[in-house]
Amino acid sequence: MSLRIALLNAAHDGEDNRRNFRRELDADLVEFDVTDRVLPDHFAFDACLVTGSRASVYWDEPWIADLESWVDDAIDEGIPFLGVCFGHQLLAHTLGGTVAPMDDYEIGYRTVEHDGTNPLLAGVDEEFTVFTTHSDHVAELPPGATQFAENDYGVHGFRKGDVFAVQFHPEYDPATAEDVASGKDLP
């Protein structure tokens, strides 16, 4: 029996997210377009995943407040979480950490190092290459969280209990990375 995972899709055009996570996860993904304020009305999932977004967690948007409230309740219910990019930042913020704008935009294939302590990256070389695209970062970890991955731009992975979060995009394939990078209007 496969896992039932709530895919809390925060991308404003979620087609790539949907395709990439369905390819990478052997699970029954139940998708919710959280940018339209669509959230589960229950907590009957084996796990939840919060995707990336072009939004910032500190924006005053009703959908972000709704998402953060639901995530907080789901964590209290003991549901395991994975956050990717915006999801990483949202989980940090929800758990009491600080998210802030960066001085430089991090985009492209980057080297990240992990400390070998986290089962999420078991079997991955301690120095590995990932695709990143973000202009915000976790400036301060939530109380009780442990960092397990980083690079020169900052925190790239943390864990608190059954909540795991990564700043990079493990789900991106080369076509998605190229599409995302070519669509950015950078200084």
Where are these predicted regions, by residue range?
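Cysteine-nucleophile active-site neighborhood
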Residues: 51-118
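Catalytic metal-binding/acid-base residues of hydrolase active sites
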Residues: 33, 55, 87, 136, ...
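Pocket-forming structural segment of enzyme catalytic cores
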Residues: 95-175
